[in-house]
Swiss-Prot record:
There is a cross-link at residues 143-145 (5-imidazolinone (Cys-Gly)). This is Histidine ammonia-lyase. GO terms for cellular component: cytoplasm. It catalyses: L-histidine = trans-urocanate + NH4(+). GO terms for molecular function: histidine ammonia-lyase activity. The lineage of its organism: Bacteria, Bacillati, Actinomycetota, Actinomycetes, Kitasatosporales. It comes from Streptomyces avermitilis (strain ATCC 31267 / DSM 46492 / JCM 5070 / NBRC 14893 / NCIMB 12804 / NRRL 8165 / MA-4680). Its EC number is 4.3.1.3. Keywords: Cytoplasm, Histidine metabolism, Lyase. InterPro entries: Aromatic_Lyase, Fumarase/histidase_N, HutH, L-Aspartase-like, Phe/His_NH3-lyase_AS.
Amino acid sequence: MHTVVVGTSGVTASDVLAVARGGARIELSGEAVTALAAARGIVDALAAKPEPVYGVSTGFGALATRHISQELRAQLQRNIVRSHAAGMGPRVEREVVRALMFLRLKTVCSGHTGVRPEVAQTMADILNAGITPVVHEYGSLGCSGDLAPLSHCALTLMGEGDAEGPDGTVRPAGDLLAEHGITPVELREKEGLALLNGTDGMLGMLVMALADLDALYKSADITAALSLEALLGTDKVLAPELHAIRPHPGQGASAANMLAVLAGSELTGHHQDDAPRVQDAYSVRCAPQVAGAGRDTLAHARLVAERELASAVDNPVVLPDGRVESNGNFHGAPVAYVLDFLAIAAADLGSIAERRTDRLLDKNRSHGLPPFLADDAGVDSGLMIAQYTQAALVSEMKRLAVPASADSIPSSAMQEDHVSMGWSAARKLRTAIDNLTRIVAIELYAATRAIELREGLTPAPASQAVITAVRKAGVEGPGPDRFLAPDLAAADAFVRDGSLVTAAETVTGPLA
């Protein structure tokens, strides 16, 4: 099993994916253990002094002016976890919770939180045991971080609340810890606050979204190329010299991908010297510009994610010179903004894919294809309602593109009077990515069927490889009407598991 070592200087996106999705084992580095102990020594020294220190000997949020006596401080830390574990709604996915916990452990190990080494080790032990706290959909405003979701995780650390075991059953967390030989932690000064004051949920979802969208943008380039081919479009617009004079990196990459997929096709318009069309519709001709802009959005979001993965987000933080200082680094705005940005880009990619699909089905714009790609139009409806489904998905994606980060709402008696809503931005982006996968799958279904209806013209070798593979995957080709939902589900799985990209790359080699 792969092992991820957590040190003091952050983690990588690959580390997050390995833990969240791959079940990688976690170890703490010796450097991290030393830093944890040193920071804890600073907190213990401050806790012994009469002066109040936020998070160590005071209340929280709007109650920060209350000085807490020594004998109540352990109760204070337990209470903040219990009271802040106030989430509601459906359970959050296992991979999201694992990413959330791992990223909190990353910050704890930075040596800036004052959490004891044994608490950090218990966090790692819970993840290694495959125990997943029950975290709910609603409860985070994205500032001070993802409070309620992280509190549910901290509750498990205390042996309280519910958690999911390795077998997928939900049981009392205390029972699961006992079965795996894990001793619940007794929280001390600052530890409760340090376990729940971070942007780890939204960051984990951002990292996973970037991985998913990387694959989807490649898939969308392939389906755009298939649609261009099916519509007898021209690939001249994909020429490298045209994209070099507007040098957006993503645009060039998408154009190169499409050109590679179309190499050797007999359907693209440049083979027809007397072709009356000199320009294709925008949804075909401008595919690299739209997908490329999305790719550049991914690059910006990835830069933000990398900075966050190298950050220590807590309030207050322990500094090497012995100070414990309040700060605003828990505000999720940097992450929230790019999550919203990605939702906008994803919605537009879905929109342009749907427009190409609609063009394939319209006999007045498809350049010789039968209405709705039907076998016997009138008797058969073909893919008419598949496009309805695609349109419904696009419509929802447009609603999901409305920025959550622009909708701050005050809380905590106006002490926390501006929040990021980054968790909400991340949740809606996950839905948008699911929708986009389905939209691309429907374009794939329509485009491969349309190419097969172009009898007498040989598609590009890469296109043929995709058609052959998707048929083997259970997606039926042209013919009389049949129950469509299973075909669409099979096409969705073909895109989702990477088979589409794999099939194309058997001919093209690695795509960008």
